[in-house]
Amino acid sequence: MHTTKLTIVVAALLVAAPAFAADLKIIVPPGTKPGGNYSQGILIDGTLYISGQAGEDAAGRIPADFGAEVKQALDNIGAVLKAAEMTPADVVSVQVYLTDAARFPQMNVIYTGYFKEPRPTRTTVVVAKLVGPGNIEITVTARK
């Protein structure tokens, strides 16, 4: 009896596994590639998870001006959203990583211009250093 139940459960999982895989889509904006071993975005069941986006352009350059760096990070997020046929209005959660708390007000002004009401939830964390040379990295989750 126990073996029969186990067999049924295993069979059900094997049948369901392709359905889960079929709903997963890797999102890569045209003309870009991730800077490491990760996906820029993963869309699964209508939810888009975007990896941390730094303020660097497609050539890997980071603007000297912090405001331009923030805008570039948000533009990079916008490119992933667009590739997934979403907009900033679909974003439900944001995590911002800054290397300097004194730059929070400037980041916040630019952020406020990008995300309109109702704004997504947000956590902002000050870190000692990012993996790359930038001063900001932003991760978002969006839902259609």
Explain the meaning of each model-derived region.
Residues 3-9, 14-75, 79-92, 98-144:
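N-terminal presequence-like segments and the immediate start of the first folded domain
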